[in-house]
Amino acid sequence: MELIATAIIIGLGALGAGIGNGLIVNGTVLGQARQPELKNELRQTMFIGIGLVEALPIIGVAVGFLLLNS
């Protein structure tokens, strides 16, 4: 049962991160198309957002391994 729970946690975390990253990059590209002079500021904000989104699947993997080894 723990194996299935771990797979679900890691899989849904990766799915959510992929969707979130896609939305962040989409917004950044649209913003750069509208205001090219803000390219560097938008890129910096995009990388911060991607870092925050990617933190959740990493935590999910850690929780999954804790469930697996308990």
Curated annotation (Swiss-Prot):
Annotated site residues (Reversibly protonated during proton transport) in this chain: 54
Gene Ontology cellular-component terms listed: plasma membrane; proton-transporting ATP synthase complex; proton-transporting two-sector ATPase complex, proton-transporting domain
Residues that span the membrane, as ranges: 4-24, 47-67
Record keywords, A-Z: ATP synthesis, Cell membrane, CF(0), Hydrogen ion transport, Ion transport, Lipid-binding, Membrane, Transmembrane, Transmembrane helix, Transport
A GO term for molecular function: lipid binding
CDD domains referenced in this protein's UniProt entry, alphabetically: ATP-synt_Fo_c_ATPE
Subcellular location, record wording: Cell membrane
PROSITE patterns: ATPASE_C (PS00605)
Keyword Cell membrane found: yes
Keyword Transmembrane helix: yes
Membrane topology classification: Multi-pass membrane protein
NCBIfam families tied to this protein: ATP_synt_c, PRK06876.1
Role: F(1)F(0) ATP synthase produces ATP from ADP in the presence of a proton or sodium gradient. F-type ATPases consist of two structural domains, F(1) containing the extramembraneous catalytic core and F(0) containing the membrane proton channel, linked together by a central stalk and a peripheral stalk. During catalysis, ATP synthesis in the catalytic domain of F(1) is coupled via a rotary mechanism of the central stalk subunits to proton translocation.
Subunit note: F-type ATPases have 2 components, F(1) - the catalytic core - and F(0) - the membrane proton channel. F(1) has five subunits: alpha(3), beta(3), gamma(1), delta(1), epsilon(1). F(0) has three main subunits: a(1), b(2) and c(10-14). The alpha and beta chains form an alternating ring which encloses part of the gamma chain. F(1) is attached to F(0) by a central stalk formed by the gamma and epsilon chains, while a peripheral stalk is formed by the delta and b chains.
UniProt record similarity statement: Belongs to the ATPase C chain family.
Protein name (record): ATP synthase subunit c
The species this protein was found in: Exiguobacterium sibiricum (strain DSM 17290 / CCUG 55495 / CIP 109462 / JCM 13490 / 255-15)
Lineage, uppermost ranks: Bacteria, Bacillati, Bacillota, Bacilli, Bacillales
